[in-house]
């Protein structure tokens, strides 16, 4: 199976071009004002024009108001929504769009295999479950987590697509993919020179590392 790749937190046209050239399957825009990678709907709409056919655009939110999501839907027309806050299943599903639900593995209640699997099952209509590390704030922490916590999710026959995040970079992504065999990985700070400024070299290195694992697994 080929591991899909999403490069998240894009803020510049040249970084979209780098991700696309390297073979990324999706790019992500962050609509969380507290993030250093935040873009507003108007800017995201400009960036979206640089994304070619067959590369998905993902819109990331943290506890948004419905009107904030609607503004992104109207301006950007994302292919997928991604919720990283305390959104309920009803919050995520109210827009009638495909969505990813993020879980901060290791957070209170999500610090055991059973607890994490139980939380995931509440979002059975999600297009995928994304697993990031726990930190005090919202959004990506840039840190890894114990992948053993995913055992209950991996054993669940009703599991949705597993998207692995949390501190991934060119130097560790191969081991992470080999251990978890996720449907996809989601990377942001691990391919940056500065917050919101991606490195074309790091993106290429990341993609090459993932491809090397996928080729062996065939």
From Swiss-Prot:
Q: Which Pfam families match?
A: PRAI
Q: Which GO molecular function, any one, fits this protein according to its record?
A: phosphoribosylanthranilate isomerase activity
List the catalysed reactions: N-(5-phospho-beta-D-ribosyl)anthranilate = 1-(2-carboxyphenylamino)-1-deoxy-D-ribulose 5-phosphate
EC number, as in UniProt: 5.3.1.24
- List the SUPFAM superfamilies hit by this protein, alphabetically: Ribulose-phoshate binding barrel
Q: Per the UniProt entry, what is one GO biological process? A: L-tryptophan biosynthetic process
Q: Which superkingdom?
A: Bacteria
- Keywords for this protein: Amino-acid biosynthesis, Aromatic amino acid biosynthesis, Isomerase, Tryptophan biosynthesis
The reply to whether Isomerase figures as a keyword in the UniProt entry is yes
Q: Entry's InterPro entries?
A: Aldolase_TIM, PRAI_dom, RibuloseP-bd_barrel, TrpF_fam
Please state what the protein is called: N-(5'-phosphoribosyl)anthranilate isomerase
Q: Which organism is it from?
A: Bordetella parapertussis (strain 12822 / ATCC BAA-587 / NCTC 13253)
């Amino acid at each position: 199976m080929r591991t899909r790749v999403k490069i998240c937190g894009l803020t510049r046209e040249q970084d979209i071009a780098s991700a696309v050239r390297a073979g990324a399957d999706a790019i992500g825009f962050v609509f969380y004002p507290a993030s250093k990678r935040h873009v507003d709907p108007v800017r995201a709409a400009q960036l979206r024009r640089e994304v070619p056919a067959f590369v998905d655009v993902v819109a990331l939110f943290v506890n948004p108001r419905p009107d904030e999501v609607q503004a992104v839907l109207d301006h950007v027309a994302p292919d997928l929504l991604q919720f990283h806050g305390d959104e309920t299943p009803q919050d995520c599903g109210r827009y009638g769009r495909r969505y990813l639900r993020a879980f901060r593995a290791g957070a209170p209640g999500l610090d055991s295999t059973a607890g994490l699997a139980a939380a995931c099952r509440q979002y059975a209509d999600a297009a995928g479950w994304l697993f990031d590390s726990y930190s005090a704030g919202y959004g990506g922490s840039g840190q890894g987590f114990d992948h053993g916590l995913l055992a209950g999710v991996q054993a669940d026959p009703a599991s949705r697509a597993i998207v692995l995040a949390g501190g991934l970079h060119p130097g560790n992504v191969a081991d992470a993919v080999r251990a978890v065999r996720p449907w996809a990985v989601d990377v942001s700070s691990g391919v940056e020179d500065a917050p919101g400024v991606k490195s074309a070299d790091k993106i290429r290195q990341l993609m090459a590392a993932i491809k090397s694992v996928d080729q062996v697994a065939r």
